[in-house]
Amino acid sequence: MEKGTEALNSKVDKFQRATPNTVLVDSILLPSKLKLALTTLIFVIVLLIGLGNPGGILAQEASEDSGLEDALSGFDDEASADEDDALSGFDDGTDESGSAEDTDATEEEASWKQAFSGFSGSTGFSASYSFAKEAPADATQADWSGLTKLRPYFSLTWDAKLGENWKTRISGKAFYDFAYGMKDRETFSEEVLSELEKEAELREFYLEGSPFGSLDIKLGKQIVAWGVANSLRVVDVLNPTDSREFGMTDLEDVRLPIAMTKLDYYLGDFKLEAVAVHQIEFNKSPPFGSDYNPSTQVITEVIQESSSENTEYGLALIGTFSGWDASLHWAQYYDDSAHFKITKITVIPGVGAVPTLEQRHSRLTMGGATLSIPSGNFLWKAEAAKLQGMEFALVTDKTFARTDALVGTEYSGWSDTSLTLEFGVQHINDFDVTLEASPDSQLEDRIATTVSFMQDYINQTLHLSMFGMMIGKSGQDGGLNRMSLEYDVMDAFSVTGGVMLYQTGDNAYFQSLNENDRLFFDARYSF
């Protein structure tokens, strides 16, 4: 099956696509000194807020006691026995009828309450404003400056128990973006309007239960998150991701649920996990014409059919021990990130050889392991994996293997604060320098470093989140930075605002994001 999709001038690897909330490096469009001063000023203001006396939050709990009075019984003692006998039959019938009706009504009310108690969700709207990009001089071109998103959204989840050992979940989400209608809508590509203007989709939809004590089974659309890393992906290969707005979403929110069968067998300190992925679905990439897609042409993406022959498989042995955890992982799957394949070359006079490209997905085999060790206020973690079967456009006579490794730590010794550092490297074994040229644009070693800082203020109602990622030993291949503040107006209502800055570098894709710096805002009501 073929699907029309966009081609990126430079493929962004999984280290770059699995990016969460971010922030603190300079973008290119504003002068670096000004950006550094702006970021520092914001950070200092937030810290001053945190050092002040926190405000108090009063919580009130109310309870009501209600009861039913016993029905008054007894009639006039002076009434004749005949009257009592005659009336007693009607009284008994009335009591039985009333009692049955009350019981049925109570059971029906309890049933409705139980059904609706499983519903949860959120609604709100999100907005973003691109302050670095200028409006195009040509009015026929899409305008990605200024307001780029004004999106009301709604999500709903239903959880229900089915007997003692089974439960189900059904969730979905929908949005509509008014920003395109507020500009010249016809200047945006069909792909952008189709994928970014509106969406309604079913997300998680599964049945989960335990046929007997040591075995759990989960059937349906679900997410299986492997690994111990927060922001970089090594052994976490089963679920595709949504990277249409690169870097704007946390890793836990960016995974896409797909149809799987998962079996978990428990034996002492170990869990053996077996997964069969029935639905072949790949990453949601920025559509052609998006400000996150610099491609000038649409390139066909070849997508494998969801069939028994193309089923993906995964195995994991997870051990939870006293003082440390470890796991072993194996998977045979299709790479969620596409590679280019040259299908033909056309020689154009005065231009030269012009290749015709397709996007393909390689069948990969992964073997890996993870380790996490808590030590005081630190949590040390590591992941490593070897991927085999990688294909590229410029070297077609063999496949390649790649070794991925990650080390990181989380520190939680400060009150209401967490700090996370992660360092990852991808090494292509037996590297061929031919792969450095376009369209492959590969490096023998690709390094990524991430820093995440989160802190709560004012009785945990104000939440600061900062994230920074750099690609390359010193960020020479690009990076991104994001800072946000979330305030809980009340228990169920929160507002969030922040700034996103992209750092350019030698990588062509990050160079294309140079003018994508933006402010963002979100208001959310949860129920």
Predicted regions and their residues:
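Detector for outer-membrane/organellar transmembrane beta-barrel domains
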Residues: 164, 331, 372-392, 396-470
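Outer-membrane beta-barrel "beta-signal"
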Residues: 243, 267, 501, 513-527
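N-terminal periplasmic/intermembrane-space "pro-region" immediately following the signal or transit peptide
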Residues: 55-167, 171, 179-180, 194, ...
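Repeated loop/turn-to-beta-strand initiation elements of outer-membrane beta-barrel proteins
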Residues: 165-168, 214-217, 269-272, 323-326, ...
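Transmembrane beta-strands of outer-membrane beta-barrel pores
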Residues: 125-133, 174-178, 223-225, 267-269, ...
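Residues on the lipid-exposed face of transmembrane beta-strands in outer-membrane beta-barrel proteins
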Residues: 125, 152-160, 170, 204-209, ...
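Outer membrane beta-barrel
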Residues: 164-293, 322, 502-504
